[in-house]
Amino acid sequence: MIANNIQDALIQPEAEINAAPTKISGITRKITTYLRWLGSILIILSAVSFMLQGNAEILPAYRYWIGLGLTLLLCAGGLICAYLFHETKGARIFFGLGAAFLSVQVSQVAAMIYAYVQGTNASQPDYSWLQFSQVSPALIGIDLVITGLLLFLVSYASYSILARKHLKTLLWTSVIANALLILPIRDENIVPFIIAGLYFFIRKTECFLHNDASMRLAEGVAARAIISLPLWIMIGRSLLHPASFLLAVVISVILVIYCIYDLKRYTRSTFILYIAQWIGTLSAIAIWIAILAEFVSPRHLGFSSFLPIAVILFALSTQVDYHARLYRFISTLITLGLCYFALTEQQAMAPVVSIAVGILLTIAGIKYREKAPFIGGNICVAAGFLFYWEYAINLYTSAPWISSIALGLAVILLASYIENREKKIIAKSRIYFNELKSWH
């Protein structure tokens, strides 16, 4: 009932404003926009300052209640804008900030529960202002109930005014994300899987919401950003504890997906996409380097260990917006170098891998009409077959007369083939080289 009244109060003034005969001038609109931005920034900075400054002497329970009071104050500001001023923009901002601050409240309750459950075994951050120990179970229970109630009411009101069409989806996603955030788990081998699962769950919801044009407006983007806050809080909280291999890999995967794939949905800025592309590329390479450092001893590292880097660059070349040819060129050079060292050191399966990789590079060169992968692929294929030249020599020395007869027959047949199809061979050779010249 309370949530429905809030929702009606927030939606009703919009119709009244649309029916009003007066029009807001452009200058006034700009001034009010700047003022709203300024006020929002001041509120956020004030809350961050309270959490980061020298407030270690404040008991954890009091710190939670101060944060709760700030959340309620923001909701009160939203009600004032809706009921008293009959204005919805300010109400959206206030309730949006209130819903965002609730994730901070959830994280504080989660810290209390974790400290109580784990006791002296709790892995506390080095910063005293992030430690929430020595809180009574009764108070933790009260905080949990209050937080859960406000999470539903404030989120309901916030998403109703920001994106009423997708209210159920946003509310359901927010509840699940915050429920995972409150779990009293800090194990370095479990938390990365929780982060990965939550990320893909939110990403799936985000892709669904992005398909709706109304969710690309400022209100829709704000609602989508709010539901992802628990994920970023969980990642930031995990970075305050001892790092682990799994966490590094999960964060790197998230960076790759976001920078290479997802960011294109939000902006077309050349500068932002360019920087994000290199961040994503370096993150993808870092994943493989982390795997090598974790599972492979430096003494057992071979040149073949770096072949996946060439594969990563080639795969990313199909997704990046800039320097795709450069990615494929570098990948080709790495592949050529690795095949050369593998063949010269006579590693097992080196010729087979060289031929297989060469065929793939040749096909890629034909597909993208690029000389570097095409020529590099031909070299790899030729090098792979030449590796077996030793067996041909051994065969010749063991039975020279058989090899000589076979070679003589092949030479005569080749001469006859060239003589009968001389013009076709010359014409096709010209077409081949002219086509190759036109490639990049």
What are these regions (language model features)?
Residues 1-440:
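Alpha-helical multi-pass membrane segments and their bilayer interfacial helix-loop junctions
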